[in-house]
A protein has these predicted regions:
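Sec-dependent bacterial lipoprotein signal peptides
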Residues: 1-16
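N-terminal targeting sequences that direct proteins away from the cytosol to non-cytosolic compartments
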Residues: 15-72, 80, 84-89, 104-106, ...
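A general structural-boundary detector
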Residues: 2, 40, 134-135
């Protein structure tokens, strides 16, 4: 009987401690210092890309950049501006909003480089959407580039 009382007292006192919350854990991602390789397509389009990625040329010599270690692909589309900047901008703004049914929000970040006269917008598609980032860049006179970044994960 004494053993029963001692066991009950021990259980009550032993379980009275407050639980400690677990600290937040963060990923420690380390990437090598990037080195860049020049690329020129058959169209009026040239760029530099990361040497850890692979450039695969699609139709009309427009590349897609594959990052195998990250399971990511950056799809690019280039267009020459021929008095159709409004149409190109409308299409570029419509593209991220095709994900609105799956996205929680789509904040925009404006990019302006006055020195090189390059302007654009980065769309962060937050939520369970196929593409996490989409963007466009233009000089408003000759060149218009649209990109979509896809991560392949289940």
């Amino acid at each position: 009987m004494r053993l029963g009382y001692a066991l009950v007292v021990f259980l009550i006192l032993g379980c009275a401690s407050e639980s400690q919350p677990k600290p937040n854990g963060y990923l420690r991602l380390e990437y090598p210092i990037p080195t860049y390789v020049p690329f020129t397509s058959l169209t009026n389009f040239s760029m530099e890309y990361n040497s850890l990625s692979e450039v695969k040329v699609r139709n009309q010599a427009i590349p897609k950049i594959v990052y195998p270690e990250m399971k990511a692909t950056l799809y690019l589309n280039y267009a020459t501006v021929n008095n159709n900047l409004d149409s190109l901008l409308n299409d570029a703004y419509k593209l991220p909003y095709k994900h609105i049914s799956k996205a929680e929000s789509i904040p925009e970040k404006i990019f302006i480089n006055e020195r090189n006269k390059v302007y654009g917008t980065l769309f962060s598609v937050i939520g369970n959407a196929a593409s996490q980032y989409q963007f466009f860049l233009t000089d408003s006179i000759d060149h218009f580039l649209v990109g979509s970044l896809y991560f392949y994960a289940q």
